[in-house]
Amino acid sequence: MGQGQPVIARRAVLASAAALALPACEGKREITGALLGASTGRGHLLRDLRAIRDAAQPPTSKQTRVVIAGGGVAGLAAARALRQLGIEDFVMLELEDAAGGNSRGGEIAGIACPLGAHYLPVPGDTAREVQHFLEEAGLRKRVSGRWVYDERYLCHAPQERLFFSGAWQDGLLPLQDVGAATLAQYERFSRLVARAQQQGAYTMPVAVTPPSAAHLGLDAMTFDAWLVRERLDDAHLRWYLDYCCRDDYGTGLHTVSAWAGIHYFASRHGFHAPGSQADTASASEEEHGVLTWPEGNAWLTRKLGDGLGERLRPGHVVTRIREGRHGVTVDAYDAGARTTQRWQAQHCIVALPIFVAERTIESPPALLADRARVMRYAPWAVVNMHLREPLRDRPGAAPSWDNVVYGSRGLGYVDARHQSLDPRPGPTVLSWYAPLAEGERALLLSRSWADWLHVAQAELAQAHPDLRERVTRVEVARYGHAMAIPAPGTLARTAAGLPHSSRLSYAHSDWAGYSVFEEAFTAGHRAAMRVA
């Protein structure tokens, strides 16, 4: 996962796709595939809400205390909190056929795999609500006065490796023969992150602490501009930092703010130069680990959705939210029945992306409209490839959970069998992650699953030239607006808070300016508290 490798030529992709269609002619195994992911047809209905409203039959009307609009992590966390408060009279309206948003999972040939987010870093003490949920889910407990996480779900070693200079190395920071100048810049960046942590709180969720003047200054420039100012120009360091930004924010260091770039490290584990005392000490600390499952964070969203029953209404596109003096009216298009339903409620938790909320709320408040006008989103694809047997490996570090090729545009792949306790090699699913540039969103509609396989194959060819002959099936999850981009100015806008309303509560990670589980969960939990 790295900088600037050119996109594979369209003509070459189509030529390769044709080869897939003729496996018998070349003596190759047949590969099947499918395109999955966010329901583009339903989502694009929001482009012309007037047509839906005019074409719909007169809506039936139902009563409930609370409508939760949106069934992603924020909506699910809100539902959990409502139930904890004793509020059972609610309904959740979700566009997709299953709740979970960007944290849904799938299965190929009986092997679970992620369709989106695939891990959760062990949360710090500022994410109290998330910690409480993990305790409730049985993932952590107190033993002899300290918190201990279930080792089955902490990522097993080896956690990550990088294909660099013709071989695999442990960890993702380039190390092999990088030279003294590179190592010196690693150390300088480590000191700068440590100083930033000491000078001001980098919290997650961000709303825990109001931004300082120093944070707002960093928010006003790009991460790239800050690195230039600090004379951090080493190509290996910049590749790694760009990779980290694309992994968490969907886009690179030329686009995200300096605050976001530093926050990635300062809010969690810091940045430890190789060989430093902190690097050695942190290697064994449980609090720096990540929780993961074969199906990714779908494990968490399924836990959140347990017990919702008929209160969860999948396949429902929210088309209008109208706040009145005595309640809220919510209209939703039932994609299965092809009818519009109307819900009358005392309160609505708007757990929708900001750009969707602005289109669905009648007379949206100025703060919402202003945020929607400047929001930027990163498109993503997740390419799940079922392999009939393990890949042949190159020299160096052993196969890991996260496997990255230096210099590629993708973010590498995770292995669905990594957490398995069965030592016998066998079929598996590799999930390859590909963030796209904002201008490449149309590729999500134009590329076939075969195109995506060849893009993945081209990017992984250095490390795995045998990938094509091992694949049996490909399923591609596509997200046109996968995550908010924390571009310069985002933190300042986040500091303005949420729109004030007596009957609408807003809950989505968009309001934090970037998309991670901790932000979405906390937003949903706090929205439910406002209902009470």
Identify the function of each model-found stretch.
Residues 115-123, 209-216, 286-293, 370-374, ...:
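Active-site rim elements
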Residues 27-55, 165, 171-173, 392-532:
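Conserved flavin/dinucleotide-binding core of flavoenzymes
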Residues 201-317, 325-327:
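Active-site/ligand-binding neighborhood in enzyme catalytic cores
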Residues 310, 314-429, 463:
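Mid-domain catalytic core of redox enzymes
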Residues 83-106:
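Glycine-rich FAD pyrophosphate-binding loop
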Residues 65-91:
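N-terminal Rossmann-like FAD-binding beta1-loop-alpha1 element of flavoenzymes
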Residues 111-195:
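Dinucleotide-binding Rossmann-like beta1-alpha1 core, especially the glycine-rich loop
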Residues 2, 6-65, 84:
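Extreme N-terminal leader/targeting segments of oxidoreductases
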